[in-house]
């Protein structure tokens, strides 16, 4: 674990020192990201907004026009090209399907998985399509959750259990666990 921590610190210091938040929609990536960025004196980047700016379309419009696979290709390409420094990046929940995007994000910063139970996520979410959540026909949120969690865990440098914690507590835990 010490070797892993030391390696993480090297990446953090040598690279662009970004903090990348991954997790299910509704896990709090954008909310935590804004507070974390402010506290660390970092910029805040919402990759979903970058996608919307670069395509000129809302997420659900991309999904309607290009389908789920088309959306994921756009998401993968744009995240793989993100060139930011000293930023907290809140990613879209499906970013973990893009291998190029995740390899790039791991190269430019520390990947932090905001973990929350499926029940808590379901309670927070409204219209899934408007949130850019791509469920296949007949797929439940639980099935999507079960599909994505192993990917979040695989790519995470740090996993933060967000269950029953305030934004302030989550941010404090992230800061405490960052490489020194």
Placement of each model-derived feature along the sequence:
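Walker A/P-loop
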Residues: 30
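A glycine- and Lys/Arg-enriched "phosphate-lid" helix/loop adjacent to the NTP-binding pocket
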Residues: 107-150
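P-loop (Walker A) phosphate-binding loop of NTP-binding proteins
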Residues: 24
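ATP-binding Walker
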Residues: 27
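Single conserved hydrophobic/aromatic residue that forms the stacking wall/gate
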Residues: 1-13
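NTP-dependent small-molecule kinase module
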Residues: 35, 39, 149-180
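Hydrophobic anchor at the beta1->P-loop junction of P-loop NTPases
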Residues: 21
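ATP-dependent small-molecule kinase phosphotransfer cores
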Residues: 49-95, 99-106
